[in-house]
């Protein structure tokens, strides 16, 4: 299961975060607290998160409800957008022709001296392959970032960056579920990929009266 981190101030302002280590804002903390209760009820076996604090803190909220520790994996970090980091997407669309080109770019387009989509997808897929090898049949929560997760999901399903643009963006603290099939089933049914998308961008409303001090 993939979970995007809770909201940050940069999400509200429409700024590209990339690898900037932005904290959750108040709404983001409420989102994390709320989704944690839902995911804990699914009885996950492990939680693995990007080390950036917006993902790490979301994962720790889930872990606190599920009674699990959080493993950190650098491969789950968000795409590196280079010099675009911290800038408003609306400003970049108006003022930076390279940004406009990058939005419709091929998979190997390097964003502002940062990363390509294929580089991001390769590391997300590698994490998923490791998870299958270590936790076969388990329910594993990967907490990370919007671009990284959407692109990684598309690669798992046999698509590419172009296909990923057919998927809507991931909301803060939404979850998506991808199931892994045994190799013999994939071969017998002629599937293109052992991965199946079971749910995408699911979420729950965030209550406005959560009292963290009382644990509710």
What label would you give each PLM region?
Residues 1, 71-73, 198:
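General small-molecule cofactor/ligand-binding pocket signal
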Residues 1-5, 142:
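Short, hydrophobic/glycine-enriched beta-strand segments
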Residues 6, 146, 202:
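Active-site metal-binding loops of divalent metal-dependent hydrolases
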Residues 7-62, 110-125:
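Loop-to-helix element that buttresses phosphate recognition and phosphoryl-transfer chemistry
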Residues 33-100:
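Phosphate-coordination/substrate-recognition cap region in phosphate-metabolizing enzymes
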Residues 43-45, 136-140:
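Short coil/turn segments at beta-strand junctions that form active-site/ligand-binding loops
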Residues 131, 138-146:
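Generic beta-sheet signal
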């Amino acid at each position: 299961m993939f979970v995007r981190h809770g909201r940050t101030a940069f999400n509200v302002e429409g700024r590209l975060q990339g690898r900037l280590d932005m904290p959750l804002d108040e709404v983001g903390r409420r989102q994390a607290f709320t989704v944690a209760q839902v995911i804990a009820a699914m009885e996950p076996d492990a939680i693995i998160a990007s080390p950036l604090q917006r993902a790490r803190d979301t994962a720790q909220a889930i872990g606190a409800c599920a009674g699990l520790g959080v493993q950190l994996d650098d491969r789950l970090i968000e795409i590196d957008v280079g010099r675009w980091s911290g800038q408003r997407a609306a400003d970049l669309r108006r003022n930076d022709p390279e940004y406009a080109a990058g939005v419709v770019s091929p998979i190997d387009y390097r964003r502002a001296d940062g990363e390509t989509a294929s580089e991001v997808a390769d590391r997300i897929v590698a994490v998923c392959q490791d998870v299958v090898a270590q936790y076969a049949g388990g329910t594993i929560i990967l907490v990370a970032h919007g671009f990284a997760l959407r692109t990684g999901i598309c690669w798992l399903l046999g698509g590419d960056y172009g296909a990923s643009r057919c998927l809507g963006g991931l909301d803060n603290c939404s979850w998506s579920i991808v199931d892994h099939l045994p190799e013999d089933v994939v071969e017998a049914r002629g599937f293109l990929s052992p991965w199946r998308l079971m749910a995408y961008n699911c979420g729950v409303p965030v209550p406005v009266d959560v009292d963290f001090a009382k644990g509710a």
